UniProtKB/Swiss-Prot annotation:
May modulate the Rho pathway signaling by providing a scaffold for the Lbc Rho guanine nucleotide exchange factor (ARHGEF1). It comes from Mus musculus (Mouse). Its main location: cytoplasm. This is Alpha-catulin. The lineage of its organism: Eukaryota, Metazoa, Chordata, Craniata, Vertebrata. One of its GO terms (cellular component) is cell-cell junction. Residues 535-559 are annotated as: Disordered. It comes from the Eukaryota. The modification Phosphoserine is found at residues 373, 537.
């Protein structure tokens, strides 16, 4: 930030390293941004060097000179810092007095440290009684504490200037929005909207910088969500306002417009809340503790029993479990949860209750017996309930993920949105009512699914993303219906049609974002977050050097882009399906599982490519990707063939038939990599994605079939062993 007097560096918690040196500063000065923390780090490092010198060792001239250089460096850095602080004070009269006081304190502390470290005149130390770092280390500690405290105050006051800029920018936008809301002519609207656009750009830059600077990941996620609403809302505000101006007496057009303005105002207030770190009066947290967090905290308290660190009362532990199980009812009460999942969840919930009571009973007995056997029994009961809670969490995860994946797959073609567009242009009010009802049903399904996903998301930022998705589906669903109603009432209106298109695109975009969210939740659950594109770190082949150009030539038109996006979404859904199948396997190191997981991750990378995201950028990247994917497919077929040798003839034949479908597709994909992608790029990319989609469909089927056959084989072995034991017993 502008107020930094010394180079930045370091990471979180750097400031607190000073405590180890025996000094602290004002604990009320909470540091919330990386820039402030990193600005302080070099100063902390220099002061720590001074404080940590050994008191009773003889100092060489070289050591004394080094101490003096550090002291002078600190004083010079503080001097530069004070000049910057004073300049900021002169530009911000409301903070001038506070900044100047802190600058004076910092300057005095810097001069004190410079004086105390002036120890090169060793011959005068004893004769004139000069006080130095060698004779008054306490004075240095006090000066260091004052210096860090005053410098931190200046930095935080300067940070308030940044906050003030964001709030001022927000206020300008709100004022312009009020003018936009009241405008009555197109000409006036265009002029004001141009100003609004410039203000939004400035606000986006300020909030983007702030988002990157925040230390708290939860706040960063909330800021990202609010900024996304504002970014997408700007286009919605434009088309909704134009529609209102064109059809001023249309009630649905006004409803549509009001929805956009309301949501943007809420997003602006959320930004203010985040940067000022205060919740608006009367506002409460929109979310309760998720099931994932509840189980995590409960397990920590249970582990404390094992270590005998503390004893949570029976009532407290039972209440904590009941709070978790109360949220579990969101799953069991949902009309979209399958009977099989519901029964399993209820069974695991009952099991957790029983095992907690058993644990509490065993713990009480352990306190009186204090024997090895009692300790072992306690250990066993702790392991049992921990396992039950993990199983419950896994079942909830599978339930929510499967529901979400099925829902995205079912609505991948956006049939209802297309029907609403057609009925609008036709002016068919009866059909509008029918499809509006269908969209409302779809919206309710998606909203409930997002609520369930929040419970199992695994991190606070992902929880916030789930809440955002829920709110977006809730609001956008209503706005699509009002926009469709406006078009149906005015079927020849180009502006009304454009407005409906914008809201439908926002819905489709959120559906696509939800597919990404599923993958991120899955990554967190399996502990493989950030490994999505690990195959791209493999050595890149040097052949096909003629294809090193970017994939920019022959830019596809909007229809081609839409087709690619649709194929990509289906590929993303297949990747989620594969993950769901993989989750069923207990042996994560199984060769079939390993190759299936690799192919799933790579398919997801290609899905990101269709959105213009991810690491796949050039034809070289894509060729390498296709080669690795085809090779991974052949490795999977090889592993499945090895597994088939353990099966009976009928099962073996069934599995080999599926393998024989996948092998030719792998070879065809290898053939594609040997041809240039530079000409007719769209057609070849389309062909590649279609081929990989077919392969992933077979991979999902193979994973499912192999799992079923594996379980069948294990059950047969267990049955044979049981029969043998029975026969042996009879003999």
């Amino acid at each position: 930030m502008a107020a930094s007097p010394v180079p930045g560096g370091g990471g979180a918690g750097a400031v607190h390293s000073s405590n180890a040196a025996g000094f602290t500063f004002d604990s009320g000065l909470e540091i919330r941004t990386r820039s402030v923390e990193q600005t302080l780090l070099p100063l902390v490092s220099q002061i720590t060097t001074l404080i940590n010198h050994k008191d009773n060792t003889k100092k060489s001239d070289k050591t004394l000179q080094a101490i003096q250089r550090v002291g002078q460096a600190v004083n010079l850095a503080v001097g530069r810092f004070v000049k910057v602080g004073e300049a900021i004070a002169n530009e911000n009269w409301d903070l001038k007095e506070e900044i100047n006081i802190a600058c004076i304190e910092a300057k005095q502390a810097g001069e004190t440290i410079a004086s105390l470290t002036d120890v090169t005149k060793r011959s005068h130390l004893e004769s004139d009684g000069q006080v130095t770092i060698l004779t008054d280390k306490t004075g240095v500690v006090q000066a260091a504490r004052l210096l860090l405290s005053s410098v931190t105050k200046v930095l935080l006051l300067a940070d308030r200037v940044v906050i003030k800029q964001i709030v001022t920018s927000r206020n300008k936008i709100l004022a312009t929005m009020e003018r936009l809301e009241k405008v009555n002519s197109f000409q006036e609207f265009v002029q004001i909207f141009s100003q609004f656009g410039n203000e939004m750009v400035e606000f986006a830059h300020l909030t983007g910088d702030r988002q990157n600077d925040l230390k708290d990941e939860k706040k960063k996620a909330r800021m990202a969500v609010a900024r996304a609403v504002l970014e997408k809302g700007t286009m919605m505000l434009l088309t909704a306002s134009k529609t209102c101006l064109r059809h001023p007496s249309c009630e649905s057009a006004h409803t549509n417009k009001e929805g956009v303005f309301d949501r943007m105002r809420v997003a602006l207030e959320k930004v203010t809340e985040i940067v000022t770190d205060c919740r608006l009066s009367g506002e409460t947290d929109s979310s309760s503790v998720s099931i994932f967090t509840g189980i995590k905290e409960l397990k920590v308290n249970i582990e404390a029993l094992r270590e005998n660190v503390c004893f949570e009362s029976k009532e407290n532990l039972s209440a904590a479990l009941e709070a978790v199980l109360e949220h579990v009812e969101d799953f069991t009460d949902s009309a979209y949860t399958s009977h099989e999942h519901r029964e399993r969840i209820l069974e695991l919930s009952s099991q957790a209750r029983t095992e907690l009571q058993q644990l509490l009973s065993v713990w009480m007995q352990t306190q009186s017996r204090k024997t090895k056997s009692a300790a072992e029994e306690l250990e066993l009961t702790v392991l049992k309930i921990s396992h039950s809670l993990d199983e419950l969490r896994r079942e909830l995860h599978c339930t929510a993920m499967q529901l979400a994946a099925d829902l995205l797959k079912f609505h991948a073609d956006h049939v209802v949105l297309k029907a609403l567009k057609v009925t609008g242009v036709e002016g068919n009010l009866e059909a509008l009512a029918e499809y509006a009802c269908k969209l409302s049903e779809q919206k309710e399904q998606l909203v409930e699914t997002c609520r369930l996903l929040r419970h199992i998301s695994g991190t606070e930022p992902l929880e916030i993303t789930c809440i955002h998705a829920e709110e977006t589906f809730q609001v956008t669903g209503q706005q699509i219906i009002s926009a469709a109603e406006t078009l149906t009432l005015h079927p020849s209106s180009k502006i009304a049609k454009e407005n409906l298109d914008v809201f439908c695109e926002a819905w489709e975009s959120q559906m696509s974002d939800m597919a990404t969210l599923l993958r991120e939740i899955s990554d967190v659950f399996e502990g493989r977050r950030g490994e999505r594109c690990d195959h791209l770190s493999l050595p890149k082949p040097t052949k096909n050097s003629a294809n090193l150009k970017s994939l920019k030539p022959d830019k596809p038109d909007s229809e081609e882009q839409a087709k690619i996006a649709k194929l990509g979404l289906k590929l993303g859904l297949l990747s989620s399906d594969a993950d769901c199948e993989i989750e069923k396997w207990e042996d994560e190191e199984n060769e079939i599982v390993r190759h299936g997981r690799n192919m799933s991750r790579m398919a997801y990378s290609l899905y990101l490519f269709t959105r213009g995201e991810g690491p796949l950028k050039t034809s070289q990247d894509l060729i390498h990707f296709l080669e690795v994917f085809a090779a991974e497919g052949l490795k999977l077929t090889s592993s499945v063939q090895s597994f088939s040798k353990q099966l009976k003839d009928d099962d073996k034949l069934m599995l080999l038939l599926e393998i024989n479908k996948l092998i030719p597709l792998c070879h065809q994909l290898q053939t594609i990599t040997k041809t240039s992608l530079q000409s007719k790029v769209f057609l070849k990319v389309d062909k590649c994605i279609t081929k990989i989609r077919s392969m992933m469909t077979l991979v999902v089927q193979l994973l499912s079939l192999c799992y079923k056959l594996l379980k069948k084989m294990e059950n047969n072995r267990w049955g044979s062993a049981t029969n043998k034991d029975t026969m042996d017993g009879q003999n």
